[in-house]
C-alpha cells in the first residue's frame, strides 16, 4: 500500500528490507480489523508479488510459455488467489467490504481475469497451429474473460461505495502498447478459429 512509501518518507530508517513484507499487516488491521488483518495482508502481499511479474498493460499471449506449462502455472496462481480473496470477502463485516473490494478483491480479480484471458488466447493460438478443435473452445474462453474485464470495471466504477470511485477504472489496458497509445476501447486480441473441415 502507498502508506509504506509515506512511512518511508516520514522516517526512512524505520523501514528496512525485512519490514516491507510485514508492513501490510498493520495497514490491513487498520482497514479490516484485527481478526482479518493477517489473511488480508497475506493476500495483498501475494497480489503485489504476482503483479510484479508483469504489468497488465504489457502482458500478452506471449508473456509466458504455453508449451512448457508456464502459462497454466501462473494463471492458476491467480485463480487460487482470487478464490482466497473472495472467500475472505464473504466473511467480512459489511462495513469493511467496500474497502476490501477496492484494495484487495478488485485488483486480484482483475489481474486473475486478465491472466485467464491471455492464457486462453495463448492456448487458442497454440492449438490452432495444430488444427485442433479445442482451439475454438479456448477462443470462447478468451471472449468471456474479455467481457468479464469490462464488467469488473463497471462494478468498480458504479458499485463500490455507491459509485464513489466512478471513473477510476476507465483507462484502456487491453491492447496497450505504449504510454501514449491512443485507442478508443480495449481490444480483444486476435483469435484463431479451426474450421470444421480442417479438424483432424
Predicted regions span which residues?
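Substrate-binding groove of N-acetylhexosamine-processing glycoside hydrolases
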Residues: 1-200
